[in-house]
UniProtKB/Swiss-Prot annotation:
Record Pfam families: PNP_phzG_C, PNPOx_N
Cofactor note: Binds 1 FMN per subunit.
UniProtKB keywords: Flavoprotein, FMN, Oxidoreductase, Pyridoxine biosynthesis
GO biological process: pyridoxine biosynthetic process
Organism: Brucella anthropi (strain ATCC 49188 / DSM 6882 / CCUG 24695 / JCM 21032 / LMG 3331 / NBRC 15819 / NCTC 12168 / Alc 37)
Full protein name: Pyridoxine/pyridoxamine 5'-phosphate oxidase
Gene3D superfamilies: Electron Transport, Fmn-binding Protein, Chain A (2.30.110.10)
Protein task: Catalyzes the oxidation of either pyridoxine 5'-phosphate (PNP) or pyridoxamine 5'-phosphate (PMP) into pyridoxal 5'-phosphate (PLP).
Length: 203
């Protein structure tokens, strides 16, 4: 694990730094080190936030998957912008990401969907995510119906189930320090294809 005293503020590569921190989190966090708070806004500008799981990242951005007809899916498709916040309590570190959002390719979505447990793929069909549910029995009945429907062979990916990629224009790294004199480093760029600028911030 990276030593807590290492001066991450010298880094000039935000994605490499994020990869190092995520590796540390996987060794330190007991549950879901890839969990991240995802913030969106509705058409009136009212924020929504919920936890999702980061499934991939590279120099292009941060990828997660969802139902496009869910609340988060609709808000992202409308605003085409979102923010993320990773917080690893055991490491006393935080990473904030803001940027434009795009859909992943069908090939990416198909590959990830195929890697999911069979029950999760059935669930993608059975759950009308974010819509009113009359009872637990109604959900379990839908699961049973789709389990029977796809009892043999592959389970296709629903057209409404896919992924998003946040293409960041800002990534901020935060590390807790004594007396609230924390270290903060902000990387920004004018557009998802631009060069990164870096600055330290007061805590």
């Amino acid at each position: 694990m990276t030593n807590a005293s290492d001066d991450f503020t010298e880094s000039s590569q935000p994605f490499k730094l994020f990869a190092d921190w995520l590796t540390d989190a996987k060794a330190s966090e007991p549950n879901d080190p890839n969990a991240v708070a995802l913030a969106t806004v509705d058409p009136d500008g009212l924020p929504n936030v919920r936890m999702v799981l980061l499934k991939d990242f590279d120099e292009q951005g941060f990828v997660f998957y969802t139902n496009y007809e869910s609340t988060k899916g609709k808000e992202i498709l409308s605003a085409e912008k979102a923010a993320m916040c990773f917080h690893w309590k055991t490491l006393r570190r935080q990473v904030r990401v803001r940027g434009a959002v795009e859909k992943v390719s069908d090939a990416e979505a198909d590959a990830y969907y195929a890697s999911r447990p069979r029950g999760s793929r059935i669930g993608a069909w059975a759950s009308k995510q974010s819509r009113p549910l009359e009872s637990r029995f109604a959900l379990e009945k839908a699961v049973a119906e789709y389990t029977a429907k796809y009892a043999i062979g592959d389970i296709p990916r629903p057209s409404y189930w896919s992924g998003f990629r946040i293409r960041p224009v800002s990534i901020e790294f935060w590390h807790d320090r004594a007396f609230r004199l924390h270290d903060r480093v902000l990387f920004t760029r004018p557009a998802p294809e631009g060069d990164w600028n870096k600055e330290r911030l007061y805590p």
